[in-house]
Amino acid sequence: MARNVPEWLAPTTLKGALELRARYGDEATVVAGGTFIGILMSQKIIMPQVLLTLRHIRELAFIEDQSDRPLRIGAMTTHRAVERSALIQQNWPILTYTFSLVASPRVRNQATVGGVLADADYASDPPAMLCALNARTVARSLDSEREIPIEELITDYYETSLRPNELLVEVRIPRSVKQAVYRKFRSRSSEDRPCVAVAAAWVGGKLRVVVGAVAERPQYFPDICSLANGQQLSRELATEIGRRYAEAINPISDSRGSAEYRRRVIAVEVRRALEEVVGHE
């Protein structure tokens, strides 16, 4: 029996990719690094007829850090490039740390910043940290561009708010970030995905706590975080915020842990993350 081989579209410019995106819409599955979609295809979870690969578009692989502007990371920048960037290491060490925890060097050399967000894979490391940093994604079509906060980009398991004619082209992180911390709780091997991920940061004088890998999207509750605004972040307050997060989240059960197990871990890891965040605005 002949294999069903999908048609490959391989533009070399962003304009060319957007033209193809406009023409094919949802009929074409977009491929960035290919780490996630490769698994889905090998397990026959999805069988796309058309693949639109972005790997040849060099203009989407960049890191730009200017003192008076947000940090900009192109969608086709690999996890490894973020991890090894001297600019990131000097000015955004929390990103160096977070991306270094993703799987293995082999995976990080292939997986991209845009891909991990557009895939909306709930068990990935970067989305929670980027959300805590108040990062914005940039979605572009042939005739428009818009910024989408991470918490609005990911809408459900493996689903985003990107339109059929749009591509995610970059991530922007505001310079108002002060202290930030990322905690990855693994229930299995050191290279495993998180059972519970907690990111916390002071951004523009306000606390942002985001819990990942426990539900369909990064879990962020501004009303709970507001308890810390203008307050000394004591152990008692950190414990209370952790307790409220555990109550507010409806965790999933999977091979990394049951819902009840995750709920207990959430309370502890949120408290620990807050105890690591030094200072307040």
Predicted regions mapped to residue ranges:
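C-terminal structural segment of proteins
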Residues: M1-E281
